[in-house]
Swiss-Prot record:
Top-tier EC class: transferase
Co-factor requirement: Mg(2+)
Keywords: ATP-binding, Kinase, Magnesium, Metal-binding, Nucleotide-binding, Thiamine biosynthesis, Transferase
Protein name: Hydroxyethylthiazole kinase
A Pfam family hit: HK
Pathway: Cofactor biosynthesis; thiamine diphosphate biosynthesis; 4-methyl-5-(2-phosphoethyl)-thiazole from 5-(2-hydroxyethyl)-4-methylthiazole: step 1/1
Single Gene Ontology MF annotation: hydroxyethylthiazole kinase activity
Function summary: Catalyzes the phosphorylation of the hydroxyl group of 4-methyl-5-beta-hydroxyethylthiazole (THZ).
Residues annotated for substrate binding in this entry: 49, 197
Gene3D superfamilies in the record: 3.40.1190.20
Length: 260
């Protein structure tokens, strides 16, 4: 069995994050913008969502990291994303790709595969998305995955090796790999799948942690630990999706340490 990501490393990364809270430029989908911003704020980061192409490029040189989420992709948004990524790469700003619903739709799949050539610092997706991005057959259904994260781990490793990045494939168990090293993160709750935007918000947290100096595999794994731990804890004390969201934000705000 793969080793779980250690508490001590996760807690150290969280302390580093709290000491240097990043400014995160989020080019994310229109369904989840408010929730994503609130998750980052609850953790202590600073979100911004600048979408006009010229401004997106300018702001990416000011931010500490950039999120590219293609959930509600259209051509104008794609232009903004390419402008932001180009500027981020020139400035040395790390950026994260969330390849929402790739595989089933041609335009976004082609666009996401082009983005792979632009050197993302990390990629975060569900099993079907990661398998599709790597070129493997999947059983995805829109933004949802029918494949398991463990089944997608070989694809994640291959994708990480090919793109020289960290890949997080998330599900009942999250697996994070740089193509050579793998770590696992457990926790969370099925209730999280009944709330729009938990995966997209995780990608924003991954982007925030990619702003930190040090071992990027550990930083991405810590982002997954945070969302899984708080989500799992909160789910035990709420009645359903409606009460989950405010309790989840409170849990992120109050988070001090990471323990299984």
């Amino acid at each position: 069995m793969m080793d779980l990501f250690p508490d001590a490393l996760a807690s150290a990364c969280l302390q580093q994050f709290r000491a240097t809270p990043p400014l995160v430029h989020c080019l994310t989908n229109e369904v989840v913008q408010s929730f994503t911003a609130n998750v980052l704020l609850a953790l202590g980061a600073f979100p911004a969502m600048v979408v006009e192409p010229q401004e997106a490029a300018q702001f990416s040189t000011m931010a500490n990291s950039l999120l590219i989420n293609i959930g509600t992709l259209h051509r104008a948004r794609a232009e903004s994303m390419l402008s932001a990524i180009t500027a981020a790469n020139q400035a040395g700003t790390p950026w994260v790709l969330d390849p929402v619903a790739v595989g089933g739709l041609a335009y976004r799949t082609d666009f996401a595969r082009h983005l792979l050539t632009l050197k993302p610092a990390a990629i975060r997706g569900n099993a079907s998305e990661i398998m599709a991005l790597s070129g493997m057959a999947t059983m995805g259904r829109g933004v949802d995955s029918v494949d398991t994260s463990l089944a997608a781990l070989p694809a994640a490793r291959q994708l990480a090796q090919r793109t020289q990045t960290v890949v997080a494939v998330t599900g009942e168990v999250d697996y994070i790999t740089d193509g050579q090293r793998d770590v696992a993160v457990t926790g969370g709750d099925k209730l999280m799948t009944r709330v729009v935007g938990t995966g997209c918000a995780l990608s924003a947290v991954v982007a925030a942690f990619c702003a930190l100096e040090g071992d990027r595999l550990h930083h991405v794994a810590t982002a997954c630990r945070i969302m899984s731990q708080v989500g799992g804890q909160v789910s035990q004390h709420v009645a359903g999706p409606g009460s989950f969201v405010p309790a989840f934000l409170d849990g992120l705000y109050q988070l001090e340490t990471l323990t299984y």
